[in-house]
Amino acid sequence: IFLACIALGTAAIGAVNTVADGIGKSISAQGQSILGGDIGFELVQREATADELKQINALGTLSQSIGLRSMARLPDGSDQNLVELKAVDNAYPLYGALKTLSGKPIAELLGNANGTYGALGQQILFDRLSLKLGDKVLLGDGTFELRAILTSEPDALSEGFGFAPRLLISTDGMAATKLERP
C-alpha cells in the first residue's frame, strides 16, 4: 500500500506540472490576444492624467476602453436589463479580432449615423429584451442602435467574470450617455 501511495502521489505531481506547463505555454503564445495588448493599465473611477498618458504613449500604440455596469432600457420604458458596458476607441483591438455576426468593420458598427451611435450586444441581451438588429436602447442620456450581435472579444478573458450581457459602444458614444461623472 505504501508503494502504491508513493506512485500515485508522484503521478499526481507529474500531471499537475504537465498541466501547469501547458497553461504557461498557451499564455505565452496567446498573451497579447488574451490581454488585448502588450501591457494593460487599469484605473478605477478616474481617467488617466495628461502626464500618465504621455508616459504610456511613449511605450507604443495606445488603445483606451471604459468599462462599467449600466441599465439598457427600451425607448418605450417597457423593459430594461443590466449590461456590462464597454466603450472602446478607434484603435481597439490592438491584438486579436472582435467578431460579430455581421462581419462589418467596428468603426462602421459603432459610429454615429444620423445622430445615433451604434452598439454591439451579446445574443442573450437580444433574447432578454426581445430585440432585433436595428432596434434602439437607451443608456443614460444616449440612444444607441443595435447594429450587430457580438460573438467574441479578443480581451474578454483578461476582464474576468461578467455579471450581465456585454454591450459594446464607442468612447464617443460613452460621452453621449453622460454616465461618466467626475
Regions found by a protein language model. Name each.
Residues 1-182:
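Alpha-helical transmembrane segments of bacterial inner-membrane membrane proteins
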